[in-house]
Design a protein with these regions (language model features):
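Short amphipathic alpha-helical segments, especially helix-boundary/capping motifs
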Residues: 1-2, 14, 28-29, 95-97, ...
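C-terminal ends of transmembrane helices
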Residues: 2, 52-63, 121-131
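Short charge-dense sequence patches
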Residues: 2-4, 103-104
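Short, amphipathic, aromatic/basic-enriched membrane-interface segments that mark the entry/exit
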Residues: 3-13, 136-141
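Core alpha-helical transmembrane segments of integral membrane proteins
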Residues: 7-87
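Generic detector of multi-pass transmembrane helix bundles and their immediately adjacent loops
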Residues: 70-176
Length: 176
């Protein structure tokens, strides 16, 4: 429980990670480099609020639930705005093939947030010594579900590609 509370961190550093994650997602989608999407998943600070929200919900701590949701919304907003601004600044005019591919959703898309949630729950209930997967790896799985769609929302808005925006918002919605 204490680890989850400590993962909340200060606002400036938290938002800096969200912006940096948004920049790396944007570069990855813009240059069609999947490896950069993985890097963005490592940088994006979505795991802390997710794990804290899970603990707060289990404890019935409404104040901590509110703080966790605020952090979630702030991180997503920072990532979306960053991707939007970069698309505008660099005068991006068309969606890349990777953007289109990443925005496509199917019923199989529901498996990622389900797997991420189960992995996160297992990580929270196991002691550090008995856990086979580190908290960082579990955090990456949570971020994997959120970082690319958040970037796609911003880029899609900048391009006026509402199909990409709607599909990415749908992905964010089912994953949160």
């Amino acid at each position: 429980f204490l680890g989850a509370l400590q993962s909340i961190g200060s606002w400036p550093s938290f938002l800096s990670y969200a912006v940096m994650g948004g920049i790396v997602v944007w570069i990855g989608l813009y240059t069609e480099n999947v490896f950069l999407l993985v890097a963005a998943m490592l940088i994006a600070p979505f795991a802390g609020p997710a794990m804290t929200l899970a603990i707060a919900t289990a404890r019935g701590d409404a104040h901590l639930v509110g703080r966790s949701l605020l952090r979630y919304v702030a991180a997503l907003t920072a990532s979306i705005v960053t991707a939007y601004l970069l698309s505008v600044i660099f005068d991006q005019r068309i969606a890349t093939e990777l953007m289109v591919e990443t925005s496509m959703r199917s019923t199989v898309s529901l498996l990622l947030p389900l797997a991420a949630g189960i992995a996160g729950a297992l990580n929270l209930v196991q002691s550090e010594r008995s856990s086979l997967v580190s908290g960082a790896a579990t955090g990456m799985l949570v971020a994997a579900a959120l970082a690319p769609p958040a970037g796609l929302v911003g880029m899609g808005l900048a391009l006026g590609e509402m199909d990409i925006v709607v599909s990415s918002l749908w992905a964010l919605g089912i994953q949160i």
